[in-house]
């Protein structure tokens, strides 16, 4: 039995924090897991910036409502789910992901959760056990699944390397250079073909 585990941001949808950075005019918020492997450190830094600027969940959700999946992402996911089981493993948050999952046809997603005060301030976050994606893949394997994984960032490498097949998708030149043994693709058709060949 196979299950395909996909990253979300940068693979199926644009990076939420980059979109919010551009909309809010705060360039520091462009930093993502492509730049900072320590997710706890990255999120605490983001929360400090939000507090400093008086921004909360509503402002972020307003930007997310304008984001569409990457061109071809829904078609890729529909075709993939017609031939095998697939799940999205993301370090994003339920409060961010829901409108994007609707646009992608409601695929299954495992992600984290924000702690939000009554006034909408983001006060903290609850992460699944770290490293989340690797531990989720290992859990699938422990119940009899063969995993195939794809992502674009440092926090995807664990699940990619632990799977029977793993692929980088639209990753950075630095990550591709540092991990030349991981096949890297730029187009959904090529990724889909590689996944189908690994099934």
Label every PLM stretch briefly:
Residues 1-2, 150:
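Short loop/turn microsegments at loop-to-beta-strand junctions
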Residues 2-113, 117-118:
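Alpha-helical substrate-recognition element adjacent to the catalytic core
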Residues 110, 182-191:
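Short acidic-hydrophobic, aromatic-tinged amphipathic segments that line or gate anion-handling sites
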Residues 78, 138, 157-158:
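Alpha-helical segments flanking ligand/cofactor-binding loops in enzyme cores
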């Amino acid at each position: 039995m196979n299950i395909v585990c996909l990253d979300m941001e940068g693979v199926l949808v644009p990076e939420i924090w980059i979109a919010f950075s551009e909309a809010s005019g705060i360039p520091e918020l462009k930093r993502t897991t492509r730049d900072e492997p320590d997710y706890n450190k990255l999120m605490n830094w983001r929360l400090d910036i939000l507090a400093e600027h008086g921004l909360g969940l509503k402002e972020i959700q307003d930007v997310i409502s304008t984001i569409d999946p990457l061109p071809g992402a829904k078609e890729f996911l529909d075709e993939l789910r017609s031939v095998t089981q697939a799940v999205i493993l993301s370090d994003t948050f339920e409060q961010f992901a829901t409108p994007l999952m609707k646009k992608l046809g409601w695929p299954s997603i495992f992600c984290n959760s924000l702690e939000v005060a009554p006034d909408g301030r983001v006060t903290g976050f609850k992460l699944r056990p770290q490293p989340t994606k690797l531990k989720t893949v290992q859990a699938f394997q422990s119940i009899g699944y063969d995993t195939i994984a794809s992502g674009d960032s440092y926090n995807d490498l664990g699940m990619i390397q632990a799977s029977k097949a793993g692929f980088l998708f639209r990753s950075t030149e630095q990550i591709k250079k540092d991990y030349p043994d991981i096949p890297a693709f730029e187009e959904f058709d090529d990724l889909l073909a590689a996944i189908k060949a690994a099934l």
